[in-house]
């Protein structure tokens, strides 16, 4: 759920293209846009009024899987070029697991997003 549908649709349309997701074309895409990659789909919808908080019951953050560390670095570069604030990274997070490499940032509603590579 998003507060400003047009703003979020534009943000996610650009972000999903940058990480290799494609638009999922379905009826009413203008009201319920979605993007997919492999077997994962991601959808947004206009929310009721109110402000998101990751410290309340519900969503803490969304993590997307990156195919490589280079892909994480490319997205971080894209985030900076598009003036999207990076919370932290890209860097190694050894406290998670060996080789965990990620960048964290926020969407227009303040929802924390992560793009991470975890070596096999």
Which residues make up each language-model segment?
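Vicinal oxygen chelate
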Residues: 3-7, 63-108
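Long, continuous compositionally biased terminal/linker segments
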Residues: 36-77
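Glycine-centered tight beta-turn/hairpin loop motif at sheet-sheet or coil-to-beta transitions
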Residues: 39, 108-110
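A short acidic/small-residue loop/turn micro-motif
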Residues: 94-95, 118-120
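Short glycine-/small-residue motifs
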Residues: 113-115
């Amino acid at each position: 759920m998003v507060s400003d549908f047009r703003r979020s649709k534009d943000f996610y349309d650009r972000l999903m293209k940058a990480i290799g997701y494609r638009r999922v074309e379905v009826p009413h895409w203008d009201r319920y846009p979605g993007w997919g990659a492999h077997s994962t789909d991601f959808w947004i919808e206009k929310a009721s009024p109110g402000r998101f908080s990751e410290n309340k019951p519900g969503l803490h953050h969304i993590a997307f899987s990156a195919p490589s560390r280079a892909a994480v670095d490319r997205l971080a570069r894209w985030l900076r070029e598009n003036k999207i604030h990076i919370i932290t990274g890209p860097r190694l997070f050894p406290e998670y697991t060996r080789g965990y490499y990620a960048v964290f940032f926020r969407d227009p509603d303040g929802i924390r997003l992560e793009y991470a590579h975890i070596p096999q």
